[in-house]
Amino acid sequence: MTRRIVLILALALALVAPAGIARATTADKPAVLAGWTQPTKASYAAWNAARLDRGPWKEYGFDWSTDDCSASPERPLGFDFTIACRHHDFGYRNYKDLGQFRANKARVDDTFYADMKRVCVRHHIAVRAACYTVAWTYYQAVYLFGSVTAVRQADINRAATLMRDR
């Protein structure tokens, strides 16, 4: 219960005054990280705002490095999952740095899927099913293997077939 309250407070503060949190102690890093890796639109917005203005967060020592979608395409069939992949990399790398990866992997993977579905919903309804299929395939790859490198061309071809059949 206490952990949930801390998480809610950290997320609320990150949305209202990101620079104020950044001036807090780095002992708050796990709470800030948790706030930025939830499968919600608000969490994504807070993380993305910090990603675009990293200066105030420098003292936390977050690892912002990314390989985008690893060896898989960032834009399969034109669906741009680049930022979703970067958000996923951010969660994986930083939870590994904190030694809390195993406890948070499933949520970071769920966040990745939620981010991709938010990309899909912006596409025309005629191709949305294909987008959701690719997103589900990418999600299953990270869920099972920890990387989207497991996505095969055949999976993308299946989604392309769905697009043509609509």
Question: What residue ranges belong to the model's regions?
Answer:
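Bacterial N-terminal signal peptides
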Residues: 8-17
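Extended terminal accessory/targeting regions
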Residues: 2-5, 20-166
